[in-house]
Amino acid sequence: MTVIKPDYEVLDALYDEVNKEFFQGQLPEVVLTVQRHKKAYGHFRPLAWDGDKHELNISANYFKGEPFEILVTLHHEAIHVHNFGVYGKVKDVVDNKRHNEKFRQACVDFDLYVVEDEQIGYVTPRLLEKQSECWQTWYAQMVEKYELGKYFNLRFPDLIGKGLLSTGKTW
């Protein structure tokens, strides 16, 4: 059996990079966790740690996938952190499942492509095409800077104009 041990320092650094690149460093520190989830790439738990730190979870199921999936998941979950800070107790999901209009608008504002799914609300399967070339450069820099190839099975697709993360999973 192969054991995949997440490097929390790398995940923390990647969250910081997403925060800096897309949110001008305005998001608070979070606690990053890795657990198994069959139907989600990650999830957000507001004020889960000592009542003052949010938790972002990344599903262990995807550590054998493309590093891009982790970066987009961190970006997606960071939008939840942003929305919680802006709206307070007002959630951007309904019944902890469906992403609502507040989430959709924040995705548009922070460069994630959004599609609507009747069962799960708004989902972010890829970046906006206008940003994909920029993101591809940033992505390549992150892969090299943090040596992500040793954590993930690198396939490094051409991201421009392609349907990214079309695995049917949700965030």
State each model region's role.
Residues 1-2, 83:
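A short, surface-exposed helix-loop junction/capping segment
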Residues 2-52, 60-64, 88-171:
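Metalloprotease/metallohydrolase-associated module, dominated by Zn2+-dependent proteases
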Residues 45-47, 70-73:
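Surface-exposed beta-strand edges and their flanking turn/coil or helix-capping segments
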Residues 56-60, 77-79:
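Active-site-adjacent structural patch at catalytic or cofactor/ligand-binding sites
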Residues 58-72:
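A broadly used, surface-exposed interaction patch
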Residues 72-85:
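Active-site recognition of the HExxH zinc-binding catalytic motif
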